[in-house]
Amino acid sequence: MDPYKNLNPKGYQRQRPFSSAGESGGSGGSGTAHETDDNKKKKKLLHRDIERQRRQEMATLFATLRTHLPLKYIKGKRAVSDHVNGAVNFIKDTEARIKELSARRDELSRETGQGYKSNPDPGKTGSDVGKSEPATVMVQPHVSGLEVVVSSNSSGPEALPLSKVLETIQEKGLEVMSSFTTRVNDRLMHTIQVEVNSFGCIDLLWLQQKLVEDLILSTGY
């Protein structure tokens, strides 16, 4: 007997099932890798959709912002960053304007009160002094829109009731948010808060002039 002869030739084939198992395992791994690739593709598509939606929403917001800005702040500027800077400058200018007009209003209120306390003509009563003052209208920007301040005599044909002021403002297509009236030395001061959707499109001086015409000039006050 040849000692080098393999007595069990099948023994060397016993490893084949092991090799087959390896092949089976490789097939399973390929399936898992395929599923992983599908998940990655789905995530990429989802991320792409979210990013596209975000850009559309931002474009809509910037378009809305441009409609609220006066032309002088964005004229000749196309970049979004320029529009944002224009909005910042507009807000700063508006805040400064509000402070300036508020200080002017307070000054006028103090002057009005002092004018009625001091009687320049001894032959006139305080009521007569009040009647000599014409009605006034002032329109100024406010945080939530506009503020309309109307001052008139508290009695007599020159008096401007709050109902008439509100009616005139609403005829201009403006929405009144709140209103209140104070009395200072026979004078009525109506303060009306008005909501404005597109502040940059309203000319404050034009609106003030129209209110003066409708409330004062048309009635001869």
Curated annotation (Swiss-Prot):
By its UniProt entry, which InterPro entries does this protein fall under? bHLH_dom, HLH_DNA-bd_sf, MASH1/Ascl1a-like
Q: Where is this region: Disordered?
A: 1-46, 104-132
The entry's localization annotation reads: Nucleus
Q: Which PROSITE patterns match?
A: BHLH
Q: Which Gene3D superfamilies match?
A: Helix-loop-helix DNA-binding domain
Asked whether the keyword Nucleus is assigned, the reply is yes
Q: Which CDD domains match?
A: bHLH_AtORG2_like
- Looking at the record, the residues that make up the bHLH domain are 42-94
At the top level of its lineage, which domain of life is listed? Eukaryota
In this record, what's one Pfam family? HLH
> In its UniProt record, which GO terms are filed under biological process?
regulation of transcription by RNA polymerase II
Q: Which UniProt keywords apply?
A: DNA-binding, Nucleus, Transcription, Transcription regulation
Any GO molecular function: DNA-binding transcription factor activity
Q: How does it assemble?
A: Homodimer.
Q: What is this protein called?
A: Transcription factor bHLH126
Q: Which organism is it from?
A: Arabidopsis thaliana
Q: Which gene encodes it?
A: BHLH126
